Structures are given as structure tokens and as C-alpha cells.
Amino acid sequence: MILPPISSTPGLRPGSENPPRHAVGVLTPDASPGKTSTAAKSPSSDLPGPGLSFDPPSADLFAADPIQRAATLADVATLIADCQKCKLCEGRTNTVPGEGSATARLVVIGEGPGRTEDETGRPFVGRAGELLTKILEAIQLPRAQVFICNIVKCRPPENRLPQYDEIAACLPFLYRQIELVKPKVILALGGTAAQSLLSTKQSLGSLRNQIHRFRGIPVVVTYHPAALLRNPHWKRPTWDDVRIAARLLDD
């Protein structure tokens, strides 16, 4: 799988107590044989307009793959725990497959585990995680009713951006998790999550305020909670994005 080069758009590193600045990566799967288009359809005229639509290859094409044979989220987590497809396995304390409801209406996707997540094996448990929990509760969604995960399932060294091969190794796990949960809406947190999920080079700013599609599922893009810790003025636009997701859930 070929992944395009990293962009230079400034961003913030998730998963850190005092997140340093970094470049938001253009970390996307090759669009072939999947397909990205701009033909998504807005479900309601009072919601933002359509954005990208990405449809990775059908799972039927990979039926012999152990990941596709995983029948439950626990099965996927077991495969992740045994994964050695990239060098991230060499420095991890724990894999972080994700957690939450197996029948969640909302799937939340971040970039990758930070130090606390690596230590605990759970996603979004540091300061950024506390903020995410509050955001979800503000739209009457207890954390336990949501499925929360990341693009990569192991912590990159020094909380650096995930590299191309690392994302490519982890995307099949994410795809299978989404297939099993069958959410009504996906919330992508930060540029890496949005670009990787939608297979696009577009910046985070250009992806906001649109309703994208991943295999037909509406995708809303917003800032990563770690970015909000350093840039409180982004909280208002983030809240606007989250309310779009809430309206889609209620639609």
C-alpha cells in the first residue's frame, strides 16, 4: 500500500500532557483499489453539504485474511495484540485496540495512543481523553455507549506522527472494527484520522463543516481534543462539529 508524503500544515500532537506542535500528516491509504469521490449526499438540507466519499475494497475480496474472519471486537483485539507487521510492536507496552460498545451508534477515531494509553491499553485516558468524555456527555452520550479507537493501535516513539507503513498495517483492523460495530456516524478527531480514513490529502480545515462518507457511513471531522488543550479558541468550532454529529445521530 502506497501512502502519499506528509504535508506541512501545523497541528498538535495528541496523547500528550503538554502536546508539542507538529505537522499534521497526510497519512492516507492509496485510493486504489478503494475509491474516493465527492459524490456523498447530505441527509438533510439544514446540515452541511456533502464532502468526500471513500469506499475501500469489499471485505469479500479478503475473506481468507484472519482479520476479516474475526467475528467480534474481542477477536480483532486478540489479533492486534499479536501483530508484528511494523516496528511499533518493538517499543509498545500494550496494544490499544479500542473500547466501548460493540453496537455503538457513534465511532470516534483518533490518531494513535499516547504514553498513558500505552501504559493502560486503553484509548483516550489522559487529559485529552477526559476532555473527549466531557464532549460526549454534552451531547448525552456516555462514553460506554460509544466505540473509541485510533488509526494506529500502538504508540509511536516519542509520540511522533505515525509513519506510512504503520498506518497501512493498522487500517485493516480499523476497517474490520467499523464493519463489526456498524455505527450510524463516525467522528474523526484530527488531521491524521480524517485523512487516513477518507484517503485524502485535504487539510483538516478544509475537511471540517462537511458530511463525508466512509462506506456510506456519515463522517464528521473535527479537531483532536489534545489540540484544544493548547488552543482553547478551537473549542467553539469543535462544538459546532460535534453538534453536527449529534444531529446526524438523531436524524
Regions found by a protein language model. Give the residues of each.
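A polyanion-binding, active-site-adjacent surface
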Residues: M1-D251
